[in-house]
Amino acid sequence: TREELERELLRIVRRINPNLTTRTNTYNKPKTETDIGIVRQPFTDVDKQYWKQFGIHIDTLKKFNVFSIKYFLCNSVVRSTYKETSPMYAYKVYDKFKIYRPLASKFTKWRTNLTNRHVQGLAELPKEGGEILIITKSLKDVMCCYEMGFNAIAASSETTFIPEDILKSLRSKWKHILILYDRDATGMHKAREYSKQYKIDAFFINKKFKAKDLSDAVKVNGFNIVKDWLVNTLRKYD
């Protein structure tokens, strides 16, 4: 076998050079889970201004377990600290965290140990269900929906969808489930794919808002204007 051949070659090499040190191959070693820890702090004025531009209030952040953090750790190593020029937030989803640095580069904006089972906003839904549930692509948009009077959830990342067993359970409680993804090539493609696969209606932010998602539309156009549009758009599902 390959293992026997490797052991025999190792014995030969050691006879030739007894002082040689070798290390065991680790390519089959399973990946260890990243442990993320946080140190919370009160919301600063910078934080309040940042979330206010999306129409999201502090009480809503608290409801959805969003924290301002001094720093976070990965496997007990400090990875980043809060700065007023680069604020930092932790989304707690059940027992895991998603770190969000909105002003950082796209390479360091996110850090997460969520799995696809960690559906954002799921724990905050009314247990009895209701009329309309929106599946969107971020917790920020989930919170915008909540501020506008609608219930919403988001998958753990933009590359996954709601697990089928969770979706099945939601179908039994919600009369209408809709998809609201980004108005860009990727978002529209994935929304239509999931719409066809799961037979769920998909819709997108109106082009007139010149924004790709709900939170950006609020930032650019104002909360009440976008809320009126959303209410009117969803009226047909009443």
Residue positions per predicted region:
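Non-catalytic accessory segments of DNA primases and related replication-initiation nucleases
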Residues: 1-73, 96-115, 147-148, 160, ...
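Phosphate-handling DNA/RNA-contact segment within nucleic-acid enzymes
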Residues: 72-174, 190-191
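TOPRIM fold recognition
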Residues: 128-133, 139-238
